[in-house]
Amino acid sequence: MKYRDLRDFIAALEARGELTRVTAEVDPYLEITEICDRTLRAGGPALLFENVKGHAMPLLGNLFGTPERVALGMGQDSTAALREVGELLAFLKEPEPPKGFRDAWEKLPIFKQAMSMGPKTLRKAPCQEVILEGDDVDLDRLPIQHCWPGDVAPLVTWSLVVTKGPNKTRQNLGIYRQQKLGKNRLIMRWLSHRGGALDFQEWQSAHPGEPFPVAVALGADPATILGAVTPVPDNLSEYAFAGLLRGSRTELVKCGHADLEVPASSEIVLEGYIYPDDTAPEGPYGDHTGYYNEVETFPVFTVERITHRRDPIYHSTYTGRPPDEPAILGLALNEVFVPILRKQFPEIVDFYLPPEGCSYRMAVVTMKKQYPGHAKRVMMGVWSFLRQFMYTKFVIVLDDDVDARNWEDVIWAITTRMDPARDTVMVENTPIDYLDFASPTAGLGSKMGLDATTKWAGETQREWGTPIVMDEAVKRRVDERWGEYGIATPPPPPRHSPPSDERGHDDV
């Protein structure tokens, strides 16, 4: 199912029993965070808080609190169907030349659809039904969450930040948190390598002393929101990808203050500028690591115009120790990443980002090993192929007889197939998340690769053990006769068996 806007998605979730309207008064200071956190951990519904203390505007939380709702937001019926999204992205990222006329004819609709999904600009838009300027600009109108006791101030989240570099033909769409400083001032926390920060740096070089235009869209349609966090190929804009997910072109409208365009169906839009040398210390804030981050200085965004729909809905979230909403997003996007990685590395069988690893700091990969040293090639590929894994600190590579998503399997393979000195790869002075205070230098640290695959000739001098596997006929007989044994507990599943084509080093 496709959704025109956020309200369409809310209605669909409510019809499925996936959204609860909370009519009791709730406090945006800490209470909403605790409610959303408990609900998310229980796999509960999206929450529409209709009576937020001190505010007339409702707040939407826990929208993407389950992988299934992420899939629905991307227009898919199940998380398994997200593999199809990944296959589409893999094809668009590196399209293969057609093998013949018939192949070219079959691929033509995909290209035509992708090329026809560029956004279209409207003259009037729902997000501009109400316009506030001058003294009417007041961020206190928004029920901005104060998420954790140690947070310095309320924090704007789920904001789609729209920027455009002076030499760019296409806008950048990024999600950056913003600390509330006053009625019209927010701190724009973007790291130096992110698209918005790069646009700002280019603007400062090309237009020194001039204010940098910025727009922030809150409450866009789910396809546009999720398009901003998906590894979209560089030759495809986030808006075009959102159109592919939605099945219709993304509708935009021009801002009143700057040459920027925002999603027309957004609930709320903030327009303004970053003025030269206007910075402020940001934080501390509770973050996805489960810790409060350090205080750092970032540019200040001055809001000069607020537009919104009639009766707008404020979309919000929180971040904390996993599981949180970003961790759930990462879990769902696992399915998108697999086909993209397999396009470059066909030997990869599965790829998993454990949510307890802060969604991206650890990756578990299973592969069909084909030669000595193959596992090390794959781990290097994970670090280098997609920029989303630039901050991944640990990569564990396993044979395909191991379930990457089962820690019992993974730990068994690590402890039985690894020699720490031989099979550990350490890489120093690599890019690391600035929020990772475990690294010795902010933004720079080390990475570890663990080769937990079966070792082949050339990797070991020893005879490699043969895995213990029960006879299949015996397992079937026990399944059939379990009720005769008089054992009260239900039969456990049989032990996982390695594939029949698994080869040890003696088979080389």
UniProtKB/Swiss-Prot annotation:
Its cofactor is prenylated FMN; Mn(2+). Keywords: Cell membrane, Decarboxylase, Flavoprotein, FMN, Lyase, Manganese, Membrane, Metal-binding, Ubiquinone biosynthesis. This is 3-octaprenyl-4-hydroxybenzoate carboxy-lyase. Homohexamer. The active site is at D287 (proton donor). Gene3D superfamilies: Single helix bin (1.20.5.570), UbiD C-terminal domain-like (3.40.1670.10). GO terms for cellular component: cytosol; plasma membrane.
